[in-house]
Amino acid sequence: MDKLNFLTAGIPLRAGNKGYEAGFKILDEMNLDGLELEFVRGVRISDKSRDAVSAATKVITAHAPFYVNLNAREEDKLEASVQRIIETAQVANELGGFSITFHAGYYLEQDAELVYNNIKSKIKETKSGLDRKQPAKLRSGEI
């Protein structure tokens, strides 16, 4: 993309409970470029919503669940965090998404450089796993 796009975080509030189709109409009225799918508590989207997002001619991004911590001490939390990122990327990719966003982790009273290196390593591992599972069309930054 070679322009700055303006998106809403989720469906505009004015759409009420009318879903993505109504949301996209409001985005058109507001002259906005798209929206971020908000997978705040889990990567879930109904078939009807998938169809509406897939048919949209708007820029789509996605926000992974908040329960991500690539600096977790517990292996099960690390695995679940990686899985949440991969699921978000896969769904975003399926729906024509441009990119995903996630909060990578917490300091847990550790040294900043250690935390940075832990998270960087896990992001590389996650990206490699995702590339093996399904080559993504998502924009990928340098790690």
Predicted regions and their residues:
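Active-site acidic/histidine proton-transfer and metal-coordination neighborhood
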Residues: 71-143
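N-terminal pre-domain/capping segments
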Residues: 1-64, 68-87
